[in-house]
Amino acid sequence: MAKKVVALIKLALPAGKANPAPPVGPALGQHGVNIMAFCKEYNARTQDKVGLVIPVEISVFEDRSFTFILKTPPASVLIAKAAGIERGSGNPNKTKVGKITTAQLREIAETKLPDFNTKNVEAAMRIVEGTARNMGVTIAD
């Protein structure tokens, strides 16, 4: 018989840098999960993506064991990295802070495709383009 899931925890952590300090410790500790085991496994699975924020979905079972699924980094993080900016514009309609090419847009959309509710790359590109526009990043052809 399958183990019963007692909690589903969603966190966004820097790749390769999870530690027992907040937010990881309190989120996992209240469900009785071995925090260091999670941190070591998360850091090992994300060591090739250092510098990105990787969302993770942790399933905690009734025997206090856990499994986790790594998601793709947020589109805003990928756009900021491609545009070479630290953060988006505070006023995106007036102040443009960066520029990305259509090729970079397609690459980001293909990276995010598994997490989107579409299987069409063009639709994913439109979703990412909207995020870029809201960050004050323009799309160059």
Curated annotation (Swiss-Prot):
A Pfam family that the UniProt record links to this protein: Ribosomal_L11_N
Output the InterPro entries linked to this UniProt entry: Ribosomal_uL11, Ribosomal_uL11_bac-typ, Ribosomal_uL11_C, Ribosomal_uL11_C_sf, Ribosomal_uL11_CS, Ribosomal_uL11_N, Ribosomal_uL11_N_sf
Q: What does UniProt say on post-translational modification here?
A: One or more lysine residues are methylated.
- Any idea which GO molecular function terms this record carries? large ribosomal subunit rRNA binding; structural constituent of ribosome
Q: Which PROSITE patterns match?
A: RIBOSOMAL_L11
User: GO annotations under biological process?
Assistant: translation
Q: Record's NCBIfam families?
A: L11_bact
Functional summary from the UniProt entry: Forms part of the ribosomal stalk which helps the ribosome interact with GTP-bound translation factors.
**What is the protein's name according to its record?**
Large ribosomal subunit protein uL11
- Native organism: Synechococcus sp. (strain ATCC 27144 / PCC 6301 / SAUG 1402/1) (Anacystis nidulans)
